[in-house]
Amino acid sequence: MKTTYVNATIVTMNEQNEVIENGYIIVENDKIIDVNSGEFASDFEVDEVIDMKGKWVLPGLVNTHTHVVMSLLRGIGDDMLLQPWLETRIWPLESQFTSQIAVASTELGLLEMVKSGTTSFSDMFNPIGVDQDAIMETVSRSGMRAAVSRTLFSFGTKEDEKKAIEEAEKYVKRYYNESGMLTTMVAPHSPYTCSTELLEECARIAVENQTMVHIHLSETEREVRDIEAQYGKRPVEYAASCGLFKRSTVIAHGVVLNDNERAFLAEHDVRVAHNPNSNLKLGSGIANVKAMLEAGIKVGIATDSVASNNNLDMFEEMRIATLLQKGIHQDATALPVETALTLATKGAAEVIGMKQTGSLEVGKCADFITIDPSNKPHLQPADEVLSHLVYAASGKDISDVIINGKRVVWNGECKTLDEERIIFEASRYKRGLQR
């Protein structure tokens, strides 16, 4: 099946960050086979021609760190620091989740993400009461591209920890697929919730199965103090001593890093998922993304969960990410528009090991989203496309979402998820949770 999308303004995010003002994209099944300017007069014979009527077409956004199973917990635990937020709000509520609640919560997060332009994401979920097979099946039905990872903790007995490791390794072997729509990573929660033995076992699983690692690291000053007091090392050095960086690793946050740590992370191909809104809301601080990029660290933007954000709008994350760097460095050139877009598209895709997506180029997967600026005053005059995408647009502006060549959202309507049922069930299950 060959489909041509014509009469579009195409934000390619190729090496030159080229914007084609009047162009077309040809998709064959799940791949882009042509991106060009001008009127469609290709040598390709196509099955369908779709007039985009001047819509902006850009790569689908890539969210490098989420917890979609927590989507029912939006608005619970506002105005709290990270540790009391986790210990008195989030974990007690998550412990009440059944597999049915987890699926309903996940569906809500998927619906929010895909309708606001996210096509790929990397997720960590708490396995208490949760069937990973059910979560993976739910994500698969949505049509989204994802790395969904079972989070490991050292809660309970040593026997509990051993069982958690066995379960995690089983799922890694079952679901790891570097080039597929769904994959997984090894995901120890953090240095403060995992024993040394557990972190070492996670490193072993990653090496033996050649998978990536996903972990919260250096998120707060308290974490750094506590880990240093307990182990005599800061979190980065401690994680390295456990062997975690033997495989490509994504660290969520990296708010509290020094110059030596940034250089070390770059040298060991450790990537950072930057969660600006979540870090601000939990009072964790502001990650120095400018310094990370200068050190050579791969960075991708992320939302974290709705419980700490409180939405999954990647446009909002792009905007706050660039504004924060300008503010903390008192440098208006810090994190310019093109860089912010890169960190939400092709750069983010590289962070989570999905190089097959993130830009609109021949050979890439057909993952793209559209915005119609014609009826949106906040996107007018419409000629400064890149600027408007970062500083003015929002997830509510999305018209269409194509993932792997399939129309997942079309004219604002999600084709893969039952929006009315999902919202009803989310409200019903939320009322049943005991605070």
From Swiss-Prot:
EC class (word): hydrolase
E.C. no: 3.5.4.28, 3.5.4.31
Transmembrane segments: none
Annotated residues for binding of Zn(2+): 65, 67, 216, 304
Alphabetized GO MF terms: 5'-methylthioadenosine deaminase activity; metal ion binding; S-adenosylhomocysteine deaminase activity
Role this protein plays: Catalyzes the deamination of 5-methylthioadenosine and S-adenosyl-L-homocysteine into 5-methylthioinosine and S-inosyl-L-homocysteine, respectively. Is also able to deaminate adenosine.
UniProt protein name: 5-methylthioadenosine/S-adenosylhomocysteine deaminase
Gene name of this polypeptide: mtaD
